From Swiss-Prot:
It is found in: Endoplasmic reticulum membrane. InterPro entries: Cyt_P450, Cyt_P450_CS, Cyt_P450_E_grp-I, Cyt_P450_sf. SUPFAM superfamilies: Cytochrome P450. Its EC number is 1.14.19.65. Methylenedioxy bridge-forming cytochrome P450 involved in the biosynthesis of isoquinoline alkaloids. Converts (S)-scoulerine into (S)-cheilanthifoline, a precursor of sanguinarine. Catalyzes an oxidative reaction that does not incorporate oxygen into the product. It comes from Argemone mexicana (Mexican prickly poppy). GO terms for molecular function: (S)-cheilanthifoline synthase activity; heme binding; iron ion binding; monooxygenase activity. This is Cheilanthifoline synthase.
Length: 494
């Protein structure tokens, strides 16, 4: 959002806020007497809103950290103040060492609609309900044995995806946008883990893809009312609420026919049906798997492909490693990816540079605690800036340069690449501690398999000679490309 738009928004909010105050209708929320970490000076009503424009949120906050330190406070309108953590040691204290103290959530009001009033894994506070739901997902659907039993189906889907890409690109001089293909492939993978291996509902695949796209779009415009409650009556916010309800109805119509079935015992749906959950919670839990799994996996794969288009030497080095494992005479198998250290390094470097959730999900203290020895009151909101941590030059030398080699032990004797142990512990793409992403292992596996397969089958290059793909970011809770990758693909001859 450019500075002109931010100026307009700020002006409107100031006028509305002053009017509300003069009319005696402003809320008088009593903030804690806690001494908040020093941050930029706030203005009445709008807090620090005027200082949060001009770039994507995580970059703005990373720049503020250079001025105010690795732990500081920002005030976003009528929200409680938010503590921003931009250093790995402090992040580790919040996420791991005192994980239970910081395990509650602070979610935008609009998320209530699609989360059964915050009754899912990502939105609910830690407690018996959260623990049971997370245990069901990981201990039933996402067990290594259950995931491995579907490798042959992943490989079949990948073969179909590659054939579709080739056919579609052939009609357009080899030009292709890979994102939508990868989204639908991920929906199929997750659907089998949710409903069973015999899942074949293409209507759900396409419908869920479009529903998730709409939720991401709406989320980018619906957060103003969380900061300024008097904005809840604005037509734009009411429109966003209506749109979310409409998307929810579409999702319900896609999922409901499957709920009445008798799912296999190794599926997420089976677990959900064995609990005392109403239909709204079951649908919310299923939607959450898609919501957190589809865009994150597909978009990270496309970010990786974008870097490989820009860095052809790295792409060819990766291709040679893949061929060394496959022998060049067969397609990539899921089991192959753990034999490819350079592939793993490319993945890590992609997630370092473009963490899919650069500010993670907001944490809230569940009790009085401390940070760096200073008291933090119960109910305080903390956001960890993963982007800032991943771009710390003291940990990652030349942090804005794409260098997978920094994560390889056999070349890491070069001190200019950084300390590999420190870098590994500072890579928090899936967060850390008790609220670490429940689907982390599946996400890493699908990302590695998808990337290896696409590089094995196609050479990826610029769609227009000499014009490198854009790395600009469009942040709507997750880190998307402002201009999704369009590349030229050429079949490789093995």
């Amino acid at each position: 959002m450019d500075e002109t738009i931010w100026l307009i928004i700020s002006t409107v909010i100031i006028v509305l806020g002053i009017a509300k105050f003069l009319l005696g209708k402003s809320s008088s929320s009593s903030l804690s007497t806690m001494e908040w970490p020093v941050g930029p000076k706030k203005l009445p009503i709008i807090g620090n809103l005027h200082q949060l424009g001009g770039d994507v949120f995580h970059v703005v906050l990373a720049n503020l950290a250079k001025v105010y330190g690795s732990v500081f406070t920002i005030w976003v309108g009528s929200w409680r103040p938010m503590i921003i953590v931009s250093d790995i040691d402090k992040a580790w204290e919040v996420l791991v060492n005192k994980s239970s103290d910081y395990s509650a959530r602070d979610m935008p009001d609009i998320t209530k609609i699609i989360s059964a009033n915050w009754k899912n894994i990502s939105c609910s506070d830690s407690g018996p309900f959260w623990h049971n739901l997370r245990k069901g997902l990981q201990g039933v659907a996402l067990t290594p044995l259950n995931v491995a039993s579907q490798y042959h189906l992943q490989e079949r889907d990948m073969k179909n995806l590659i054939n579709s890409m080739y056919k579609d690109a052939s009609r357009k001089n080899g030009i292709l946008k890979p994102l939508d293909y990868l989204k639908e492939e991920t929906v199929r993978l997750l659907s089998r883990l949710i409903f069973g291996q015999d899942f074949q509902d293409e209507k759900l695949v396409v419908g869920m893809h479009h529903a998730l796209d709409d939720l991401v779009r709406i989320s980018g415009y619906a957060s103003l009312a969380d900061a300024f409650k008097f904005c809840e009556n604005l037509p734009s916010h009411k429109k966003s609420i209506r749109e979310v309800h409409e998307v929810k109805k579409r999702v319900e119509n896609l999922i409901r026919p499957h709920i009445v079935s008798n799912p296999p015992t190794n599926t997420y749906l089976y677990f959900l049906k064995t609990q005392d959950f109403n239909e709204d919670i079951i649908i919310s839990a299923i939607l959450e798997v898609y919501d957190l799994g589809v865009d994150s996996t597909a978009s990270t794969t496309v970010w990786a492909l974008t870097f490989l288009v820009r860095e052809q030497e790295i792409q060819e080095k990766l291709y040679r490693e893949i061929v060394n494992v496959t022998g060049g005479k067969r397609s990539v198998k899921v089991e192959d990816v753990n034999k490819m250290p350079y592939l793993q390094a490319v993945m890590k470097e992609t997630m370092r540079m473009k963490p899919i959730a650069p500010m993670a999900i907001p944490h809230k203290t569940s009790k009085d605690t401390s940070l760096m020895g200073k008291k933090i009151n119960k109910g305080s909101v903390i956001m960890v800036n993963l982007y800032a941590i991943h771009h710390n030059p003291k940990v990652f030398p030349e942090p804005y340069k794409f260098m997978p080699e920094r994560f390889l032990k056999d070349v890491n004797s070069d001190e200019s690449l950084g300390n590999i142990k420190t870098m590994e512990s500072s890579l928090l793409a899936f967060s850390a501690g008790m609220r670490i992403c429940a689907g982390m292992e599946l996400g890493k596996l699908q990302l590695a398999f998808g990337l290896a397969s696409l590089v094995h089958e196609f050479k990826w290059s610029c769609s227009v000679d000499g014009k490198l793909p854009d790395l600009s970011e469009d942040h709507c809770f997750i880190l998307l490309m402002k201009n999704p990758l369009e590349a030229k693909i050429t079949c490789r001859i093995h």
